[in-house]
């Protein structure tokens, strides 16, 4: 342990040109974390993350987050103007607390019993841990001692008696640093955590751009790029879930960075509740980026001895542009975030009943739809909303939520009987396999027209006597209550135990409005994570899919438990290109649910060719159908078995391969290439989205291939990787809207 002076002696150490060595050896589990005195370096294969303790005060100052470095490292020289004393407001800080002259956004703000919000969290000690400890009650990345090493830096405020343990886990193979903080009240009185960021990064003086995802229902994940201006800018969710409006993801890059070239930093918060992302360029030109819990939904009281652990935030660095950043996140999440056995397993082609039947069905029509699905070669039949409710049957969206018992009017012989009939069907008349059965749930919600609400109105979130506002005729259950968590676990378990159910679609169709306190949002998510963990552990052979009116909760927190998420309720293929490519900035395509739907499309009214619709959906890890085959034209119905076979051929590459966005979503010719992990196979998805008269045919240039290797293109022509990447190929289209799926095989 090192003793440090108090803040009164800060200035003396602030102007010291401080230099200590960084050892330049390949990153591994033995040198991923290098400690030299009180200078700390985390090394990935291509990245270094470095900070040090100020000798005079014990404050943590940031040095470098970027390309891997070695040797002696100079820290910032802080300017002095007209004799004025410099403060920590002029330096790059690692975990900025409130007060003491730093007027930028803090990573932590604590209100003490006396009302003070000043903190002085200074270095006390550090610990290096092989591997990575779990975060109590929260989703988190994981790995063995060979995969990851963790540095914990222990800070302490002697006046308030508050401790903060900063956790840094380095995954060298993925150039990823994962950060979180654990705050403990070691004093005698209560304190209130008003702000807590999982990660704060101060970038050096330079111009930067930022990219983020915005949207709304049915138009999620639209990417936006803008210059980082002086002052503050940012986005958040206050809806109690990550939401359609913004995603807990941020990318920072140099203005010259493109999809394939240039420095890019990616930040992804492993959390599903209300969050905040703030970016501030200060007067000195430094840019500070913070991601964490939303301060407006926090006010977390810590009694003596209690702790608050932040969600973790993943930070990656790539010199290979925005695409390089995305591929690092994809690989990390596939291998070290998603716990499900289905993370990289081939997904069954499914048919979901919602757009085909809606609420209008009974056991006869359900069986008929399942039979038609099996005849087409579908492997999994999913019965969506409407199957439950006894006294308050779910025949529309205004009743039944909360009463998770099968509707006896729809299923007079019982739901297990219906499941048995459906799972006796054979996909494509292949008697060696049986059709699987899945079911839709929305367990976090309750209708006022339900037995549950009449028995437990207090279980619905509310704020005293204020009106309980409805969305889609429903209220939100208070998942912070252990009795509500236990009810949900038992209700879902009873259904899964009653029949051969191999898939669950878990929906969430509204945000949180009224709560008894700001901290309820985070308490809700902790309760929700307990439910997710319990059920997915109890039923590991069930394929779980997340949903929140589409992609309203498409975030890393959900991916810990559910390997796939319904990307959007918008199934229009042209719209989906934008939504899926935007989602892929942070999330692996393996996690995306994407379906071929009927035309005219229910959301846009647009009619597109069936091959185009199917090819767009194949770019998601979970390909399915969202229609009623009985209503399809004969030529489209006849095409479905071949499209399913194609989807099953590309699915292993989409699930496990690297994704290259060759041409942007707003191009007339969007293009995406997937390359298998061994580099032996690749598949190109290429689209024409609008007609051109007498226009030259563009070339699409591949990326990520071996320039020295030779590849066959659809088993025909052969070209070198260098030719495919530098010259490219032309693909003519014979209609105004068209698509191609092209296979490459390394010879």
Curated annotation (Swiss-Prot):
Glycosylation site list: 36, 182, 190, 362, 429, 449, 534
EC number(s) recorded for this UniProt protein: 3.2.1.22
Residues at the active site: 507 (nucleophile), 569 (proton donor)
Signal peptide: 1-24
GO cellular component, one term: extracellular region
Gene3D superfamilies: Aldolase class I, alpha-galactosidase from lactobacil brevis, Golgi alpha-mannosidase II
GO biological process: polysaccharide catabolic process
Disulphide bonds in the chain: none
Subcellular location, principal: secreted
Cofactor(s) for this UniProt protein: Mg(2+); NAD(+)
GO molecular function list: alpha-galactosidase activity
Catalytic reaction(s) noted: Hydrolysis of terminal, non-reducing alpha-D-galactose residues in alpha-D-galactosides, including galactose oligosaccharides, galactomannans and galactolipids
Key words, A-Z: Carbohydrate metabolism, Glycoprotein, Glycosidase, Hydrolase, Magnesium, NAD, Polysaccharide degradation, Secreted, Signal
Cellular location(s): Secreted
Family membership: Belongs to the glycosyl hydrolase 36 family.
Subunit annotation: Homotetramer.
Functional description taken from the UniProt entry: Hydrolyzes a variety of simple alpha-D-galactoside as well as more complex molecules such as oligosaccharides and polysaccharides.
Protein name according to UniProt: Probable alpha-galactosidase C
Gene name linked to the record: aglC
């Amino acid at each position: 342990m090192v003793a440090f002076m108090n803040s009164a002696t800060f200035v003396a150490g602030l102007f010291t040109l401080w230099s200590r060595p960084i050892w330049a050896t390949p990153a591994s589990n033995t040198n991923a974390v290098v400690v030299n005195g009180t200078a700390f370096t985390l090394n990935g294969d291509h990245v270094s993350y470095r900070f040090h303790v100020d000798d005079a005060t014990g404050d943590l100052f940031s040095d470098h987050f970027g390309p891997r470095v070695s040797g002696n490292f100079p820290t910032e020289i802080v300017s002095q103007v007209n004799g004025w004393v410099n403060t920590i407001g002029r330096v790059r800080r690692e975990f900025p607390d409130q007060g003491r002259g730093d007027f930028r956004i803090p990573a932590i703000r604590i209100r003490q019993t006396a009302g003070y919000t000043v903190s002085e969290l200074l270095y006390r000690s550090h610990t290096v841990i092989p591997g990575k400890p779990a975060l109590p009650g929260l989703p988190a990345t994981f790995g063995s001692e060979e995969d990851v090493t963790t540095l914990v830096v222990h800070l302490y405020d002697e006046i308030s008696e508050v401790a903060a343990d900063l956790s840094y886990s380095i995954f060298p193979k993925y150039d990823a640093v994962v950060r979180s903080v654990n705050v403990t009240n070691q004093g005698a009185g209560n304190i209130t955590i008003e702000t807590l960021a999982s990660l704060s990064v101060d970038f050096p003086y330079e111009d930067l751009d930022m990219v983020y995802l915005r949207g709304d229902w049915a138009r999620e994940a639209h990417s936006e790029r803008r210059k980082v201006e002086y002052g503050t800018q940012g986005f958040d969710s206050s809806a109690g879930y990550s939401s359609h409006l913004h995603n807990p993801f941020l990318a920072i890059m140099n203005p010259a960075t493109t999809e394939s070239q240039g420095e890019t930093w990616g930040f992804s918060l492993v959390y599903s509740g209300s969050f905040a992302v703030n970016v501030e360029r200060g007067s000195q030109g430094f840019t500070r980026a913070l991601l964490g819990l939303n301060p407006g939904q926090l006010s977390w009281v810590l009694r003596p001895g209690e702790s608050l652990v932040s969600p973790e935030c993943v930070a990656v660095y790539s010199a290979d542009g925005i695409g390089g950043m995305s591929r690092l996140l994809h690989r990390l999440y596939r291998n070290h975030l998603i716990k499900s056995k289905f993370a990289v397993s081939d997904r069954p082609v499914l048919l979901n009943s919602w757009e085909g039947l809606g609420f209008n069905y009974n056991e006869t029509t359900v069986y008929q739809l399942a039979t038609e699905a099996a005849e087409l070669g579908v492997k999994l039949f999913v019965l969506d909303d409407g199957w439950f409710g006894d006294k308050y049957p779910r025949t529309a969206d205004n009743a039944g939520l909360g009463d998770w018992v099968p509707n006896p009017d729809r299923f007079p012989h019982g739901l297990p009987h219906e499941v048995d009939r459906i799972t006796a069907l054979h996909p494509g008349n292949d008697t060696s396999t049986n059709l699987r059965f899945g079911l839709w749930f929305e367990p976090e919600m309750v209708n006022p027209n339900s037995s549950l609400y009449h028995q437990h109105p207090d279980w619905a979130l509310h704020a005293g006597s204020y009106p309980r506002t409805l969305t889609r005729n429903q209220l939100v259950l208070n998942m912070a209550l252990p009795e509500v968590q236990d009810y949900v676990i038992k209700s879902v378990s009873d259904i899964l135990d009653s029949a051969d159910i191999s898939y669950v679609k878990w929906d969430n169709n509204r945000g949180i409005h009224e709560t008894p306190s700001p901290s309820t949002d985070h308490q809700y998510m902790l309760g929700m994570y307990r439910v997710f963990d319990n059920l997915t552990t109890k039923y590991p052979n069930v394929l779980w899919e997340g949903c929140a009116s589409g992609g309203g909760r498409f975030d890393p927190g959900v991916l810990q438990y559910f390997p796939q998420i319904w990307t959007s309720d918008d199934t229009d293929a042209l719209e989906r290109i934008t939504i899926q490519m935007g989602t892929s900035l942070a999330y692996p395509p393996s996690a995306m649910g994407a379906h071929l739907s009927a035309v005219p499309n229910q959301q846009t009214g647009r009619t597109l060719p069936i091959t185009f619709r199917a090819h767009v959906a194949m770019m998601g890890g979970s390909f399915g159908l969202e229609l009623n085959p009985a209503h399809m034209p004969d030529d489209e119905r006849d095409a479905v078995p071949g499209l399913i076979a194609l989807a099953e051929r590309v699915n292993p590459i989409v699930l496990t391969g690297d994704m290259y966005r060759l041409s942007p979503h707003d191009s007339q010719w969007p293009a995406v290439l997937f390359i298998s992990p061994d580099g032996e196979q690749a598949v190109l998805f290429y689209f024409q989205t609008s007609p051109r008269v007498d226009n030259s045919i563009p070339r699409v240039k591949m990326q990520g291939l071996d320039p020295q290797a030779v590849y066959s293109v659809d088993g025909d022509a052969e070209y070198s990787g260098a030719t495919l990447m530098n010259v490219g190929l032309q693909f003519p289209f014979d209609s105004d809207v068209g698509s191609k799926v092209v296979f490459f095989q390394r010879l």
